[in-house]
């Protein structure tokens, strides 16, 4: 499974599996989708005294969603182009683009939570989400809490995006089912990742087995398996 990931990444880097146009479409669409979901709408009953914090969380959702290789989204699009019928490649592209973006939004949710679990100060050279929110509220506890909720909102957003995209495709139930399976496997993988930290260091073979098991559940499930 590790070899599969390495080969896919190598293909993407050396053979140009996807064009710069794909990347531009992915980036702009992710921002559009995330903004629509997390930004309080005019008819949302948000107390005026709380609006600044709600707006800060919405802005951080966009900031956290920016950047990255977009390997998962690119692999989703390339899988679609490789296996879809010719007639579907144009008709279904917009829906598949949204589905690809949903995978990336879920990754962002996982990274926001990862940074809280790991107590990380930085993500992609900028303050991690919970650190940025702590700075804005002048409270580490509130920042962590808002970071947890931001991760939850992005995870929910990813399901909403995937569901809306799937409704425009055939076999929509299977698409949503695969997406939810990905969610479940990554979440189990995070539990296993934390469990490995409790393993004794005097059994290196078991450490290797447990670590590879984490890679299968937490990394491969949404980096290659789900996009393919």
Which residues fall in each region the model found?
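Short alpha-helix boundary/capping segments
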Residues: 94, 142-146, 215
